[in-house]
Amino acid sequence: MCMDDEKEIYWVGSSYKDLLEFPEQAKHDVGYQLHRVQNGLNPEDWKPFQTIGSGVKEIRISDGGNIFRVMYIAKFREKIYVLHSFQKKTQKTSRKDIDIARVRYKAIINREKNHE
């Protein structure tokens, strides 16, 4: 995939504003990983997050002992939707963070269905 074929990133809800709260190095790392996704590659550290919905993936970033996550969906031809950006406080992803991502995922799926 060449640079002209990069998928465009769409930030859902407060996902971009929340990302801006990350420390500088974590923001840089997320940017690099999303650039990989834009060019058809997987992030270097990720996992599928099917409990949110089909095709949802989670970028995993560690910075100075802190853990950050960015949930996104890239299964659409020209778009990447960033559903949620957050700092993880415990080993398990919180119900609140899962619910935020799930609501945003459902909104995106409905929007995409209506624009086919």
Task: Name each model feature, range by range.
Residues 1-67, 76-79, 87-116:
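Basic, Lys/Arg-enriched alpha-helical interface segments
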Residues 83:
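ATP-dependent carboxylate-activation loops
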Residues 70:
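Portal/gating segments that form or line small-molecule/metal binding sites
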Residues 73:
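Conserved Hanks-type protein kinase catalytic core
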